[in-house]
Amino acid sequence: RNNQYWYCEAMKKLPRLIDATRMLVCAEDLGMVPDCVPWVMNELKILSLEIQNMPKETNLRFGNLSHNPYRSVCTISSHDTATMRMWWDEDCEQAQADYRDSLYRGDAAPHPMPGWLARDIIFRHLACPSMLCILTLQDWLATDEKLRLADAEAERINIPANPKHYWRYRMHLNLEDLLAADDFTHTLQGMIKETQR
């Protein structure tokens, strides 16, 4: 009911902020947002954030990646959410629905998440129409069972509801080992090249 008010407030402030930088602006427009937010974002050409398991359409369990708007950033997880592997194992019923409805597989969803499945999910995100696909290091590493952390729970960066659990994640590999992981590098290069990212 206050959409016009918030729209006017946004249009007073946001254009100045956007004009102050050459950066591409992205909004974290997840969850309950006022109806005016998409109007403002469209008018100011602000990219939306698209997370498949947090769809903006309330009647959907999972967003359809092929319907992501071009003016968006797609990701699988963020610093405030469970990583891909954690999400997969937190709710087996939800994972099975994703496995069936989004990945179009009829058998039982494997647990814990194998590397081939992580690669499939990442490939689908890379292939979506979003302008940018930005994934966490943990989600990239999930594709390689030799490189990823054994304990998926240790990959969590931040739990907003827990003031004692904040920004804890530290990469368990040193950069030299990551650079030397040729199979991992070639796999990622192949996916990026095939999806023309």
What are these regions (language model features)?
Residues 1-197:
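Catalytic cores of glycan-processing enzymes that make or break glycosidic bonds
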